[in-house]
Amino acid sequence: MLRLRKIEPSDLPFLYQWENDATMWADSDTHNPLSRHDLHQYIENTTGDIYRDGQLRLIIEDSQLLTLNSQLSTKVVGCIDLFDFDARNRKAAIGMYIAPEARGKGVGKQAVQLLLDYAFGFLHLRMVYAIISVHNTACSHIYEQMGFTPSSPLANWTLEGDAILWQKSHD
């Protein structure tokens, strides 16, 4: 069972590993490695309130019932964000990172659905969008499956090349 939760100090090792994965920088605004200190400060200063912080980063947890002793095993498998929040126009960008060992298992799709439920149902956003490199076909496939519409090709959007703007509206 997948759930989204607020970042906690114990998430620092995961964030440090993920934020410093240079293979993911082409699809993000990260341009240089982040220190543990930088990430610790981020965790300490984030309130979890998108209106105050302008963004909301949530940890993706996967819980499984261990049948041998009926205990719940919880594993951090990624993070998902709403960022570039525009309260007036009720829209935000979405981005996610799925740990390599969790990819291809439907985690991204489930996490996007949970975040959309929150964004549209609780925050009352009217638009969520993602800007995805044309080379990131796995991510584009998730957004397509989740009902996002590719709207604008963005020529030379990054140093790596073109990107696509994916949008999902809610009335």
Predicted regions and their residues:
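A short, well-structured alpha-helix characteristic of acyl/acetyltransferase catalytic modules
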Residues: 1-41
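Generic structural signal for secondary-structure transition and capping sites
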Residues: 12, 23-24, 48-51, 124
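Acyl-donor (CoA/ACP) binding surface of acyl/acetyltransferases
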Residues: 1-3, 7-12, 74-171
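Short, polar/charged, Gly/Pro-enriched helix-capping and turn/loop motifs at alpha-helix termini
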Residues: 29, 53-57, 126
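Residue-level detector of secondary-structure transition/capping positions
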Residues: 23, 32, 46-47, 147
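Acetyl-CoA-dependent GNAT
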Residues: 34-101, 170
